[in-house]
A protein has these predicted regions:
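Conserved, single-site charged/polar hotspot
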Residues: 2-217
Length: 217
């Protein structure tokens, strides 16, 4: 397996360093110094599990959750979820699943993929399971304005994919049944709706991640 270079993300919360590194990554992208995802033998898009936080990204734990899908609106409390078993799972919907109890910069978020509502001692958690490439269409515009140059958006897409792939392998949120959360602790996800330019950047770099020296290990 190729070793992935994650130096960019370790300094992610430092805006100045982040901007400087983005310039370097754009040069890398333009030079073609990236590699394809090494584990795509089945050609299947990897799945990622995202822990969704409350409004303003304040907490991982929700006291009450209201969802809307397929013409239904349902509110869940911890007691109601426990009556139904270990968790409530809402399968993926054609028009997505809207979580009315959360607000983001773009308004009430709508999520692709499935939603799981899981009771914990501190409250309810929400896990959104979806394909990695779909996830990236809501990460890239949340992390970088979609008005940026195309190569910058493509570099951001590759970086975001690389980071997400690493988190899937590391399972840092295993106890919460997730790979990442939707905050700056990992990557901001779902704060903005998909934007055409950002989605194109994800599509044009599909499966590409950063590698260290392009060597297998």
């Amino acid at each position: 397996m190729k070793r992935v270079g994650f130096f960019y993300f370790e300094e992610k919360n430092n805006d100045c360093r982040r901007q400087r590194m983005m310039k370097v990554l754009i040069v890398i992208m333009m030079a073609g110094m990236w590699c394809m995802q090494p584990e795509k033998a089945s050609a299947a898009d990897p799945v990622i599990r995202v822990l969704l936080t409350t409004t303003d990204f304040n907490s991982r734990y929700h006291q009450e959750i209201t969802v809307s899908y397929d013409g239904k609106e349902i509110t869940y409390t911890a007691e109601e979820v426990k009556k139904q078993g270990d968790k409530v799972r809402i399968p993926a919907q054609k028009d997505g699943i809207r979580i009315l109890s959360i607000q983001r910069q773009s308004g009430t978020p709508v999520y692709d993929g499935s939603i799981e509502i899981i009771p914990k001692a501190e409250g309810l958690i929400i896990v959104n399971e979806l394909f990695l490439e779909k996830y990236l269409t809501r990460v890239v515009p949340s992390e970088m304005p979609a008005t940026y140059e195309k190569e910058a958006l493509k570099a951001q897409a590759v970086c975001a994919r690389t980071y997400a792939w690493k988190q899937i392998q590391e399972q840092r949120l295993h106890e919460l049944e997730a790979d990442v959360d939707d905050t700056v602790n990992f990557q901001v996800y779902g704060n903005m709706e998909p934007q055409k330019a950002a989605t194109e950047a994800v599509r044009e770099t599909e499966g590409q991640i950063l590698c260290q020296n392009g060597e297998d290990n």
